[in-house]
């Protein structure tokens, strides 16, 4: 995201590498909040650009600065790129093209350098350099003395349900709660009196504590950056909760300033204990003028070489895809008879599902659109204490949809009883049910099955429940939100949805709207598997809501007045696709007419067969699944692994995502894209000025771009920007995961989610005229930034000439694909049975 007003850009900081000695607490706190991770608690996990703080810079400049400042590894290793080149995954023609574009007349010299040259290693990162002098000069490791206690206190204070006893917060905030405990407890958090006394002084300030620890005001900013980036997970979580307190169901008040004050007190106490209060401030151990930690990082030949290799890797994938899209024949005439139409999420995991449906029923049509289906609201399940957002995180809804008449009840599980945590109850249960749990555990190894331990997207909403979709009075409100939508509001959203995908005529008798979610067991990152366009929730409620709107007679009358005539016999049916188990559930089937019910039974059989084929295609990535069995048998194995307690990879989620196509289906319908592409339906003919396109790109850039970049950065640096392996993870307070009991929270994605991913930035391909697309992205600064700063690549396909234009340096320039031949997929099923790695783009016969 662009820096907020008042932020200093990297270029501005580079002109003043040495900061003024004056310490501005508010400015430093603002900068810390800007650069710390922005991952929300687990229940609200949504993919985002991990380097959001640098998004106002060009991608390669941002990578250079972020790695030089914070020590992130933001590309593959040089040897890895060279290995990919020698294996043919980076093609020589593409590498030559990229080197010429970067180095011009020096391209021959630089081709030799990148392929076989050596480069000076990068300097050590700036972060941690000042604070490291405690260990270097005074032989004391403050992190090992302070972090275990600090993390336990933070986890206890922010706990959302693991602990039996709640932290006595008093509702006044973190530091107030700590002070209350100090005043009224028999023991203390501190070992010496000085830190305790400082805490109990109500005017305890960051500057005052830093005077004791560091003394030199010119070092204060560097010290705080070093301190907070020694545990960016916890610090980032605190900034998220401070900015969005509603993200916690059990509300807690905490801010970064409070965290820093308490940590500084713990550091003073550790030094007092270690040196018996006879120690000098850090200033005495340092020499020389401090360098501004956020100053521009000098560019080196190694940076240039890595940028060249990265673009060569990306264009080795882009070029054959663009060539294949350009070669697609003109759109076929409309089908005279349509069996059904289906609206699906643009999600890359749905790409293959749509392909299988279309191959089984050539008379159907499928469309892709962001999986909230254009209806933005909060959803409140029956008997729930709070509501949840089910639309893109950047949207602030004004509407609430409530569930009523739910028949679902959570299955009782005696092991979840609170009595198991009591002294007496715990002993009794362990001696009785404990033996039975061992038997169940052993049985689950041999025969995995669904249990209350698992998370299932089908539980998000009861199929038999009712939803308060129609608002009958503007005064019908709850928590400041309007309950339901008026008829006019419903018609507006219905028009926008249908117009954005180009479905404004020739409706089939049944139109399915299929959201998606996931199911998994023993997986803290469950929200990452659901729909990103629904803020990490399943799209089931959204599917039912938009179907209600499109079936409403008054809405249809308004649409007809705007040229969208939906036949009276056409019915919209909501559904949910579980992408882990490849299962589907349909909603409100009892509202179908007799004729539609017969059609629906036939269509449901097509969906079921497509799900089995989809499971078989997915299984080629699963080492322990025999992909050579029949689709039905493979499907059963895939469903079993989804509920296994011991399966760290229930599905590979968005791994290998690299592409988003915004255009008519004929551009991709005859292509095998290996589940790597988001597919957003769009017809330029109904949107000559780009009004609908603006809405599409405004959603696709942060949603698809956030997914792509989180996978990218979690892959290239899984230890700092990812979460490492799932195996040692412990869930901390139900808000995050950490290694062990005393570790920092691990933002980003675990290695099991990204190990098969190829780190390439997403290419968005739009079917429209270049001038229209350029004017469209210029209208929205946040959208423009994604493309102008090259966090996403953008190519336009001229719908009349099929010429390609790539976006670079603020303009579209012609692009001529290097790939001259497209392979044909003779037998896809054979490929699924024998190949586990990425497959090239193929033409479908």
Swiss-Prot record:
Topology in the lipid bilayer: Peripheral membrane protein
Region (Disordered): 1-20
Annotated keywords: Cell inner membrane, Cell membrane, Membrane, Metal-binding, Transport, Zinc
Name of the molecule in the record: Probable inorganic carbon transporter subunit DabA
Cofactors (names): Zn(2+)
Family that this chain belongs to: Belongs to the inorganic carbon transporter (TC 9.A.2) DabA family.
Binding site for Zn(2+): 345, 347, 516, 531
Cellular location(s): Cell inner membrane
Recorded superkingdom: Bacteria
Cellular component GO terms held in the UniProt record: plasma membrane
Gene name per UniProt: dabA
Annotated PANTHER family: INORGANIC CARBON TRANSPORTER SUBUNIT DABA-RELATED, UPF0753 PROTEIN AQ_863
Example GO molecular function: zinc ion binding
One Pfam family recorded for the sequence: DabA
UniProt function note: Part of an energy-coupled inorganic carbon pump.
Keyword Zinc found: yes
Quaternary structure note: Forms a complex with DabB.
Predominant location: membrane
